[in-house]
């Protein structure tokens, strides 16, 4: 079994998603022998955002590529191959200003690649990366799971929809809310999230 574990929080040891994503990954390794783990810390080792130069390589012969285009094309290919090869993904994705960290968006922009992870057909787009399980580890300072709060959720819903576009339908969410609403609520939310992790079908 191949596990791809991504963290995107910029908060290092103060991060709730890092703490919880580590528990998910450890739980998977405890339940299954021979788990091959690939880990990317997208905050400590950020992936460059797409630029005109990077995308321009698609419209030029490889012999004309710049050094940056060559290195970034190689990185994109590596990220896509990691994604395709993984049986399970654990994604630590905190809510920042109602959305995801920019570091995670950079990763998504590399792996959402036409012709590799999805394709366009006469009947619309088709995802090319099925048969994967994703555990999305979410943390929010406030509460956004209710009807009103969900109107400001461009975090979980976005990630789930992008993954679905790529063909991934098996997504489970581990959520810790009210992290910024006092130490008691923070502790309770983390405790409940860990209980939910123990019940995951991994």
Curated annotation (Swiss-Prot):
This is FMN-dependent NADH:quinone oxidoreductase. FMN binds at residues 9, 95-98. It comes from the Bacteria. Binds 1 FMN per subunit. Belongs to the azoreductase type 1 family. HAMAP family: Azoreductase_type1. It comes from Chromobacterium violaceum (strain ATCC 12472 / DSM 30191 / JCM 1249 / CCUG 213 / NBRC 12614 / NCIMB 9131 / NCTC 9757 / MK). The lineage of its organism: Bacteria, Pseudomonadati, Pseudomonadota, Betaproteobacteria, Neisseriales. Its cofactor is FMN. It catalyses: 2 a quinone + NADH + H(+) = 2 a 1,4-benzosemiquinone + NAD(+); N,N-dimethyl-1,4-phenylenediamine + anthranilate + 2 NAD(+) = 2-(4-dimethylaminophenyl)diazenylbenzoate + 2 NADH + 2 H(+). Quinone reductase that provides resistance to thiol-specific stress caused by electrophilic quinones. Also exhibits azoreductase activity. Catalyzes the reductive cleavage of the azo bond in aromatic azo compounds to the corresponding amines.
């Amino acid at each position: 079994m191949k596990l791809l574990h991504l963290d995107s929080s910029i908060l290092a040891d103060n991060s709730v998603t890092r703490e919880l994503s580590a528990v998910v990954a450890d739980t998977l390794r405890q339940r299954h022998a021979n788990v091959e783990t690939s880990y990317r810390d997208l905050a400590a080792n950020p992936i460059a955002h797409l630029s005109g130069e990077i995308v321009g390589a698609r419209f030029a012969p490889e012999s004309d590529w710049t050094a940056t285009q060559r290195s970034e094309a190689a990185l994109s290919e590596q990220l896509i191959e990691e994604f395709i090869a993984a049986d399970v993904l654990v994604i630590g994705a905190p809510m920042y200003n109602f959305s995801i960290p920019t570091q995670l968006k950079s990763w998504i922009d590399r792996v959402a690649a036409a012709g590799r992870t999805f394709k366009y057909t006469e009947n619309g787009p088709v995802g090319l990366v099925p048969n994967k399980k994703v555990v999305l580890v979410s943390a929010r300072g406030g509460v956004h799971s209710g009807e009103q709060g969900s109107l400001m959720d461009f975090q979980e819903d976005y990630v789930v929809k992008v993954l679905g576009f790529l063909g991934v339908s098996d997504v489970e969410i581990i959520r810790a809310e009210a992290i910024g609403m006092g130490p008691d609520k923070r502790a309770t939310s983390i405790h409940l999230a860990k209980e939910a992790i123990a019940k995951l079908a991994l």
